[in-house]
Regions:
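Acidic, low-complexity, intrinsically disordered interaction modules
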Residues: 23-125
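Short intrinsically disordered terminal tails
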Residues: 1-2, 121-129
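Negatively charged, low-complexity tracts enriched in Asp/Glu with abundant Ser/Thr
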Residues: 2-27
Length: 129
């Protein structure tokens, strides 16, 4: 796991990204959650701009602040495509309102990532998984 953390820390340094995590709430995060989890507000700030979003910590990591690796590994790193492609790729029903909300959230995340990072930096981000 140490290698993963080092990779994420190196990415932040190489891209001049400030990483900030702040506790936000203890609640249900995903629509299908059966257990509550810690929710944090995460800010990624680069020379191109900043992006603040909520991050639901893994239930198995309760009491631990998310690390850069925890967050960066979960980010959308590729263009999403259209709704039908998204549903086909991830097994969603195209008639599902939940799928549509999820799709819109993923598109918004991708738009923010591609706004604050260059194409070259996104290629580096894609290596964190």
């Amino acid at each position: 796991m140490e290698n993963y953390q080092e990779q994420a820390t190196k990415f932040l340094k190489d891209t001049n990204t400030r990483f900030k995590v702040k506790y936000f709430d203890y609640a249900y995060y995903f629509p299908q959650d059966k257990e509550q989890r810690e929710i944090y507000k995460v800010t990624l700030k680069t020379p191109k701009g900043s992006y603040t979003f909520k991050f639901g910590q893994s239930i198995s990591n309760q009491g631990q602040e998310p690390t850069p690796y925890d967050v960066l590994a979960c980010l959308t790193k590729y263009e999403v495509g259209n709704f039908e492609q998204f549903c086909s790729e991830f097994g969603y029903d195209t008639d599902s309102r939940t799928a549509e909300r999820t799709f819109k959230s993923v598109v918004k995340e991708w738009e923010n990532i591609s706004r604050i990072y260059t194409a070259e930096q996104i290629t580096l981000l894609q290596e964190i998984n």
